[in-house]
């Protein structure tokens, strides 16, 4: 009865949001949705207490991870905004697909390599300080990108005048962004027992998915709301795709200062044994960074997770990024009031029209599926859920190769949703949850940095490679067919290594 009472506000919000979607504007729907998501995960968090924490502890923990999670969501808003902006840049000749692939690819490599320094730094300084570095640095970088965009567009600049400044400052943005993931893992490793992390991984994956939604749909809404018309043609103020995230990031940087605590003891509660591979109970590494890296890179399970997550990086952004460009490139003819009109499937297909929403739902679904079966059916082992999700991706990309070739747009849209669900679920389980399990409180950030670093090395590899492969694809489905075909081998590699870590579980090594 108590759980039913708790669920009533959530149910009412979902009903309200459904009513808004069916009867009012898409922009109002976008504005309300983040509050619905927060309500849902608050309710789910209230149901999950397998180790019997006190009510006071759980309330303080809630505010700690909620602000931390929303800070990370805002980082996503300032990371994938380039994808939204690049589609508009491409339409006006300021950024080709190859240029976008190069900028994002190099930025992703910077993100991945930065973990070599930023992982141990987060373990040493604590996640609170490094999430503040992330939000402030990314805010300033996005503000500069917005100014560059404004200057080039207002002064009639060309693609070359945009490319090099963007390459430099987007890479700087990605350096600061790389503090985000390690900060999350470092803080939450001290606040959550290993038995809580599977379901919590789903909750936190939801917050990450909210960030993807903000990046694609909220940034897209902002561009639509700020556009003007010149000679009857829409003129998009693309700089707001960078200024808006900068403002949001500064707000969360301020909240981080006052709300986040690295450990329960800093908030007036006792620290506790989290049941993971923590070596030193105070959570501070006693080894040099080189010694930690040597230990990590000689651990067979971590090495296999690195291989899996490299593939996840190829696949995740292989869908999220190129799905947008595919949708803008493919054209269909619609008949509206008896008049034929050629439109892109980005404006005609449900899945591509609501790309951010679809990716968010995919992330929520994949995260909770992976976390639930991991904790409830496999004793908090992360390998089995990752295996099932990789198998889903293998089947999905094989079918997608046919769907792209034969222009089955609805099937391509659905499969993009399904495979995003799978890959985000894997990413949450391994980079977000297993890194805490195998790193422990003292080395969690370094392990997360290594694993997530390879995610973005995979991202960089596919971004540059697919950018070159698809540069001249235009609206030719036979050329776009190389998109899913390129990604299929990485599902096979990931499937093999997820099977290899099926029984992996951390050994507790706590020392006082």
Name each model-derived stretch.
Residues 169-206:
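Cytoplasmic helix-loop-helix junction between adjacent transmembrane helices
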Residues 136-159, 391-405:
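C-terminal ends and interior cores of transmembrane alpha-helices
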Residues 198-224, 362-363, 452-463:
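Glycine-rich segments within core transmembrane alpha-helices of 12-TM secondary carriers
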Residues 21-31, 204-264:
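Helix-loop-helix hairpin linking two adjacent transmembrane segments in secondary transporters
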Residues 380-430:
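C-terminal transmembrane helical hairpin of 12-TM major facilitator-type secondary transporters
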Residues 39-48, 246-274, 497-501:
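C-terminal membrane-cytosol helix-exit motif in multi-pass small-molecule transporters
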